[in-house]
Amino acid sequence: MMLHAQHMPGQPGTPSLVFLHGFSGDCREWQPVGEQFHGCSRLYIDLPGHGGSAAIPVGGFADVIRLLRATLISYNILKFWLVGYSLGGRVAMMAACQGIPGLCGLVVEGGHPGLQNEQARAERRLSDGRWAERFRHEPLTEVFHDWYQQPVFASLTAQQRQALTALRSQNNGETLAAMLEATSLAAQPDLREALNALAFPFYYLCGERDSKFRALAQEVAATCHVIRNAGHNAHRENPAGVVDSLAQILRL
């Protein structure tokens, strides 16, 4: 089995760019950024529970990474960079730390490296469980209205919140809930030590108004690019700034 994806071919001999979206996004999320890199092959993946992969069930990160590897093989992608936002960034970090063949470099935007104690994991497990129940049983417009009131999204304007709520409400609440539970931050190990031992380039992107993830970026051995005029979802709020950073990282 493989994940649904959109593939845009590039010039032979260059590493592919593999983009992983955040929770409740889909393969379109990264395209305004990725399509500025025409020379590279680009693969935009729908993670399980989302978009064209909505019906694919997973029990945890191991299943997601297995599907990711199968998808890369199906497209004959042998050398690539992983570029992931939030949930996609956590999947990318997990894959990198476990060792995924062909990975040349890692770019994470606003991805959490992991909680550091059991109390924090227990609290997160309860929180994610409550959100999952809401996604299963309540209208998505109501759930996402509240979702985007969370402190991490404090930099969004009312208009941006309204637009995101309308966009994300097109998802399937049941499959979102299942993916939220399967890949909860509570189920993710603390990756700091493993990330610090990576043998390939690791870059971290965060919005200048995203104080939480700017602080987390200092806890991993990554070169950090701060994206101006942006909060947690920097590639949506300032795509040109993220394109500039990726161009520097990839030397394109």
UniProtKB/Swiss-Prot annotation:
GO terms for molecular function: 2-succinyl-6-hydroxy-2,4-cyclohexadiene-1-carboxylate synthase activity. Its EC number is 4.2.99.20. It comes from the Bacteria. It holds the Pfam family Abhydrolase_6. It is an enzyme of class 4 (lyase). InterPro entries: AB_hydrolase_1 (IPR000073), AB_hydrolase_fold (IPR029058), SHCHC_synthase_MenH (IPR022485). One of its GO terms (biological process) is menaquinone biosynthetic process. Keywords: Lyase, Menaquinone biosynthesis. It catalyses: 5-enolpyruvoyl-6-hydroxy-2-succinyl-cyclohex-3-ene-1-carboxylate = (1R,6R)-6-hydroxy-2-succinyl-cyclohexa-2,4-diene-1-carboxylate + pyruvate. Pathway: Quinol/quinone metabolism; 1,4-dihydroxy-2-naphthoate biosynthesis; 1,4-dihydroxy-2-naphthoate from chorismate: step 3/7; Quinol/quinone metabolism; menaquinone biosynthesis. Catalyzes a proton abstraction reaction that results in 2,5-elimination of pyruvate from 2-succinyl-5-enolpyruvyl-6-hydroxy-3-cyclohexene-1-carboxylate (SEPHCHC) and the formation of 2-succinyl-6-hydroxy-2,4-cyclohexadiene-1-carboxylate (SHCHC). Belongs to the AB hydrolase superfamily. MenH family. Monomer. This is 2-succinyl-6-hydroxy-2,4-cyclohexadiene-1-carboxylate synthase. It comes from Salmonella newport (strain SL254). The lineage of its organism: Bacteria, Pseudomonadati, Pseudomonadota, Gammaproteobacteria, Enterobacterales.
